[in-house]
Swiss-Prot record:
GO terms for molecular function: DNA binding. It comes from Pyrobaculum neutrophilum (strain DSM 2338 / JCM 9278 / NBRC 100436 / V24Sta) (Thermoproteus neutrophilus). SUPFAM superfamilies: Double-stranded DNA-binding domain. Keywords: DNA-binding. Belongs to the PDCD5 family. Disulfide bonds: none annotated. The keyword DNA-binding applies. One of its GO terms (cellular component) is cytosol. This is DNA-binding protein Tneu_1679.
Amino acid sequence: MAEGGYEDRELEELRRKKLEELQKKAELERQAQIAAAQRRIALKKILTPAALARLDNIRVVRPELAEALEQQLIALASSGRVRVPIDEDTLKEILEAVYSQSKREYRFRL
């Protein structure tokens, strides 16, 4: 019977650890959702509806580029380096700058 008690404690410890992992994961997901909602609110304030629609289209095709662009837009607007609201043409210019920074260059030697 002593072995059964040991196995029960071990099983309970495994369950407790798994529960902690799930709780941590849920908390991280919740924080990510809050951050995304805050970014969305900021973007709605600094972009025209047409520019926001273009950003949404970019997000569908290139999510990593859209995220970099969002960060750049929020930084530019908060520092006052760009006029708010940002229209679609200005967004295109910023997009070109961000895209050229994020584009990877590959070199092949033959």
